[in-house]
Amino acid sequence: MMCQKFYVVLLHWEFLYVIAALNLAYPISPWKFKLFCGPPNTTDDSFLSPAGAPNNASALKGASEAIVEAKFNSSGIYVPELSKTVFHCCFGNEQGQNCSALTDNTEGKTLASVVKASVFRQLGVNWDIECWMKGDLTLFICHMEPLPKNPFKNYDSKVHLLYDLPEVIDDSPLPPLKDSFQTVQCNCSLRGCECHVPVPRAKLNYALLMYLEITSAGVSFQSPLMSLQPMLVVKPDPPLGLHMEVTDDGNLKISWDSQTMAPFPLQYQVKYLENSTIVREAAEIVSATSLLVDSVLPGSSYEVQVRSKRLDGSGVWSDWSSPQVFTTQDVVYFPPKILTSVGSNASFHCIYKNENQIISSKQIVWWRNLAEKIPEIQYSIVSDRVSKVTFSNLKATRPRGKFTYDAVYCCNEQACHHRYAELYVIDVNINISCETDGYLTKMTCRWSPSTIQSLVGSTVQLRYHRRSLYCPDSPSIHPTSEPKNCVLQRDGFYECVFQPIFLLSGYTMWIRINHSLGSLDSPPTCVLPDSVVKPLPPSNVKAEITVNTGLLKVSWEKPVFPENNLQFQIRYGLSGKEIQWKTHEVFDAKSKSASLLVSDLCAVYVVQVRCRRLDGLGYWSNWSSPAYTLVMDVKVPMRGPEFWRKMDGDVTKKERNVTLLWKPLTKNDSLCSVRRYVVKHRTAHNGTWSEDVGNRTNLTFLWTEPAHTVTVLAVNSLGASLVNFNLTFSWPMSKVSAVESLSAYPLSSSCVILSWTLSPDDYSLLYLVIEWKILNEDDGMKWLRIPSNVKKFYIHDNFIPIEKYQFSLYPVFMEGVGKPKIINGFTKDAIDKQQNDAGLYVIVPIIISSCVLLLGTLLISHQRMKKLFWDDVPNPKNCSWAQGLNFQKPETFEHLFTKHAESVIFGPLLLEPEPISEEISVDTAWKNKDEMVPAAMVSLLLTTPDPESSSICISDQCNSANFSGSQSTQVTCEDECQRQPSVKYATLVSNDKLVETDEEQGFIHSPVSNCISSNHSPLRQSFSSSSWETEAQTFFLLSDQQPTMISPQLSFSGLDELLELEGSFPEENHREKSVCYLGVTSVNRRESGVLLTGEAGILCTFPAQCLFSDIRILQERCSHFVENNLSLGTSGENFVPYMPQFQTCSTHSHKIMENKMCDLTV
């Protein structure tokens, strides 16, 4: 049997560097790329010969070549096989096209791998590589997977990643040396290999150079050089907290938590699968942390995943988050449950699906408990599919068996689904709380009536029943109870005091609400005074910070009452206006002190203690009086102060004055005070010595040695600081320049940013010190100590824009202080920008001044604008009729806007052009006593005669009337009368001889007939030969001298005699009388015209239905229309029957006239 032994085929793949520039590195994309290596006959020429590379192998003769030997040992015979083949490795797509190799076209040199082997004559070696920066920006990861046709196995492969990360950013760096690359071992598994490269956060924007070395089955491969920027290939972590909910609008809201660790904004890609009546898959990219999916459908399921990426498009998409599934029911209620209180409002939304069909919101009806249909006025249509119902002023839910909620159903017009929403409405009962004082002498009970519904006319009262011992298991309202007087306090609570009390007796209490409709009792509660004790607070409370241990020690003494075991609670905090309290529990009843760990040992703490029964019954006592700690040293200072120096003297001389400056230690560093500072000096020749500077924060000494080291110590009452800062002054180190550049940019008057670059050196940089001051001023220098790895720093100070500042940056090494970089003023670009922005400071004041000027102009022209747009309201005091009126009295305005208090004279009213005739007759006596008229009568003819019936129709009422007298005549009238335009006439008749008869008769109320027939009336005969026949005839009666209202009683015979009087009026023996006028109105205003005015200002209207019906005039309140002994003269010159006059009446007379007099309107 022959055994064959295979020797390992060794492939050495050497990388050829073109030493032209660093741009030979291949810039990889921030996503997946592929590495192809293969013999010439496996791919086309484009794969084997990159752009700019020659196709023949003779161009590579100058390169060093590795020999691959395949050795077979068969039966102890060594058989070597040699063949030479040139292999190329490049990056490209899966088909091997557009394969890139790095060449230098100017010199014709190619970066390639030269390989001699016959084992890869037919197959190439290909890998799939992906690189990214981890989301927390701490680790750079490259993942490599072999393609399916790769002949090597991962488990037999060893992969190393070699990388170089420069120290500084430079546009034209030198080519990297091979020895400068660092090696990282990659972890390989069956699926692939993964390499981890740690990248400092400060170098994320630097160019990272790297390449891969792969060893498998004894064969080594080396990839081309790759270049990338870690910040551009960041792969964030998948979003967390993915959840979904249905909004009030019926949309599905997908939300997730934002990644707060990412230093840049992110975009998110949401992938969801909707499975409802149709299957829909969508992916959307958003910048917010939520996404609304329109029109959520009932009976659907949504599977959602989210991933993130940098918002600017660079970087790598994160992995998808874990899928979340959200399923909706056939009927969707949102929200499905509501818990609310009495009197509030609540709304439900619903989407109804029936047999794979969405019901329109217009067809949805709502039911409560499937027994009460909710009125449609409470419905609202949110969208075509979403319906809303609103409950206003909710009442308490009535329990139905075990159901303590109302079931709200969203139904179709034909049927309801079994799913429902739940509505909980809670009514809070009246809570009675009682507490017994610390001396165990009285019990105070409090309760609030706010939970009682507003009930008009109700009263509240506390009633109680005392049981001899303890409380019953279930307290109930006792039939014999006593009321307790309670007093309403300012806080709205009622307070009742029970004194004396029985500690072990049970007091059952309840609130009774008394109302006229009945009384209501709140649920009773039983109180045991011994179980509601509020103890007295602990006394003699002390607090202190212990020395060396640094603990807050609190001690107290327990109260005398009660005698039960007590637990204690301590609260403590930093003393100030707003104390942030912390609490500590002490359950040991015998304990009288406690020690607490505090963070600030040098602060003043305020401490209080309270107690309660250990078994939990009763209340906490009030807090004790506060106790305060004293600030004292508890430990030696934690460290010495940070310090810096200021140099004086000539820099060329060997002796210079050095002034040390340091900042006082804080309490937390000094623990808790500093009594003095000590400066230690160390030199090579003079040894070591110390100086005590007391509480000063500076010290000046003479620097004469080549190297002088100083240390500043802080000393308190317990000793000196253990950790201190050293500063070495060295002449050789003062010439070391480590700062290449320094720039200062003003951001505002209170902030300046400094940026710098450092040059590499052989010294160990400890930290940097920034100095700044006003240029050409020795005083006012300020300084800051910053870490050595910082490249820029924000200085916050009060910078004066017109001043020039000097900025200095000192590198501090272990060996001493290096040479500073000093700049005078800000960087030129920043100054130009400020000068360009100076125009803004000029434009803004101009705009503000213009606005102020415009506002002033508007205020000055306010009166003109007011007259232009609004009419000027006249001042009543400038009117003649308002002279002498006091507008401060309310009565003035009452008379002013209702009726004038005095007569207002108008000119004569112009009559319409119509024929006028008048006749005045005065009769002194009646023919017989029975026919006498007990009052003066004035006839006013206002109607038109009916040519057919020869009658006069006065009113719409057709009733016959008897004129009281010796004779009576039956009068008939027509129902309707045709009225024609006419002029009003009046006849004035006075009889002073009938006064006594009038007084004897008294007040007679006998209405005159509403209609007078011309066929039986003696008036027609009396007026047959006069001008009255041509006009309409109506009678108007006025009382004569009677203090009361008189309705005359007439007969036609007496009226006939009255009209036959043609005598003269006597003028002597009569005093002047006032006259009452009749108003004349247009015939077109017959229904509402004014007919009668008087001296007292009576303005009356005469409706047709009231003509000759109960006509009265108040004689003593208005002017006498006809006096008893009226004398107008025989000629009648002095009597003017028509003088239209509009006058006013007093308020009192006006009211009487309105109440007791009929309107006189035709």
Swiss-Prot record:
Disulfide partners: 37-90, 89-99, 131-142, 186-195, 188-193, 350-410, 411-416, 434-445, 471-526, 486-496
Free-text disruption phenotype from the record: Mutants are hyperphagic, obese, infertile, diabetic and have impaired growth. Have wet brain weight significantly lower than controls. Brain uptake of leptin is also reduced. Animals have an increased bone formation leading to high bone mass. Have impaired T-cell immunity, Th2 responses are favoured in mutants. Conditional knockout in parabrachial nucleus CCK-expressing neurons, treated with 2-deoxyglucose, have increased levels of glucagon, corticosterone and epinephrin concentrations compared to wild-types.
Keyword Signal applies: yes
Region (Leptin-binding): 465-482
Effect of residue 894 to A: No effect on STAT3 phosphorylation
PTM characteristics: On ligand binding, phosphorylated on two conserved C-terminal tyrosine residues (isoform B only) by JAK2. Tyr-985 is required for complete binding and activation of PTPN11, ERK/FOS activation,for interaction with SOCS3 and SOCS3 mediated inhibition of leptin signaling. Phosphorylation on Tyr-1138 is required for STAT3 binding/activation. Phosphorylation of Tyr-1077 has a more accessory role.
Subcellular locations according to the entry: Cell membrane; Basolateral cell membrane
Phosphotyrosine carried by residues: 985, 1077, 1138
UniProt keyword annotations, A-Z: Cell membrane, Disulfide bond, Glycoprotein, Immunoglobulin domain, Membrane, Obesity, Phosphoprotein, Receptor, Repeat, Secreted, Signal, Transmembrane, Transmembrane helix
Sites where a glycan is attached: 41, 56, 73, 98, 187, 275, 345, 431, 514, 622, 657, 668, 686, 695, 698, 726
Effect ascribed to mutating residue 1077 to F: No effect on EPO-induced tyrosine phosphorylation
Ranges of residues in domain Ig-like: 329-427
Membrane-protein topology: Single-pass type I membrane protein
GO molecular-function terms, A-Z: leptin receptor activity; peptide hormone binding; transmembrane signaling receptor activity
Domain of life from the UniProt record: Eukaryota
Extracellular side: 22-839
Modified residues (Phosphoserine): 880
Record bears the keyword Repeat: yes
Stretch list, region Required for STAT3 phosphorylation: 896-904
Motif Box 1 motif positions after renumbering to this chain: 869-877
Cytoplasmic side: 861-1162
Gene Ontology cellular component annotations, sorted alphabetically: basolateral plasma membrane; extracellular region; plasma membrane; receptor complex
Domain notes: The WSXWS motif appears to be necessary for proper protein folding and thereby efficient intracellular transport and cell-surface receptor binding. The box 1 motif is required for JAK interaction and/or activation.
Self-association and partners: Present as a mixture of monomers and dimers. The phosphorylated receptor binds a number of SH2 domain-containing proteins such as JAK2, STAT3, PTPN11, and SOCS3. Interaction with SOCS3 inhibits JAK/STAT signaling and MAPK cascade.
Its job: Receptor for hormone LEP/leptin. On ligand binding, mediates LEP central and peripheral effects through the activation of different signaling pathways such as JAK2/STAT3 and MAPK cascade/FOS. In the hypothalamus, LEP acts as an appetite-regulating factor that induces a decrease in food intake and an increase in energy consumption by inducing anorexinogenic factors and suppressing orexigenic neuropeptides, also regulates bone mass and secretion of hypothalamo-pituitary-adrenal hormones.
Name of the protein described by the UniProt record: Leptin receptor
Gene responsible for this protein: Lepr
